[in-house]
Structure formats: C-alpha cells, structure tokens
C-alpha cells in the first residue's frame, strides 16, 4: 500500500506513516500503520474528507427470506460502511445477514428476543432495543411481515436511515 499521509500519534508524539484510515461513529480518526498496527486516536474530531465514519447497521427482514444472492449483492455494496452488523437472531434475513458478516470479518452484535420474559411482545421489544442501539437499518421485506414493518417504522420514527429491499 502507498502512504496516504503522515500524522502525529497523540499517545507517543511520533510522526507516523498512514496506510489506511478508519473513523469511528463520533468522527474521531484511527490510522492504520505498517504491519496492521493501529495507532491510538491520532486526532480529535478529525476525519480525512475521503473517510466516512463506520456504522452499526441492522440487517433484518422476514423469516421467509432465503435468497442469499440478493442479500450478498445488496450488502457487498455497503461492506465498507459496517462497523458492526446488528442481528436479531431470527431465521431468514437475520441469520443470512450474520452469515454474510462472518464471511467479511465484520463483528456481529446479537440482540435476540426474550420470548420467555416478554411473550408475544418480545420481537417488538427487541426491535426497539436494536433501533436504539444501531445507526441504520437495511431491511429485506416482502411487504407483509409485521415484525419487519415495525423495525422499519421504529427506525424512521427515530430519524435513522432505512434502506428497504423488497422481495
């Protein structure tokens, strides 16, 4: 890789050569150095203009969604946006999303419904917990699933980005 630029490491005060960059959700930059070593936060509130902060993104949808090819095609376009994939743990779109994340070495945050404690409301409670935690939603929806509709509606109510892929 070519050197992108040089920066002072705020922990060691050394000038370091930057090969790649990553910004956290607060817009604070982390810089990747030689031999895959990350330096400590090199600058407060600084992200190079070509770097977009990564996000915690929910990948959710109906339990009857089974088309991994469609999911892979949609998520591969966004692979660099993911800090973490948030997963509700249900079969279908949720589990396919987790499979995709594992193949791309993206951390997964499982937030499964507690059916024992909450009964029929468990899925909706879990959806709201995921919505509060995450930055964005990518939903695979058949236009019928009430759980997916609830997830979409809640994220929109929070003013967070929602991308719906209809199948």
Regions found by a protein language model. Name each.
Residues 8-9, 25, 50-52, 77-78:
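Generic structural signal for beta-strand residues in well-ordered domains
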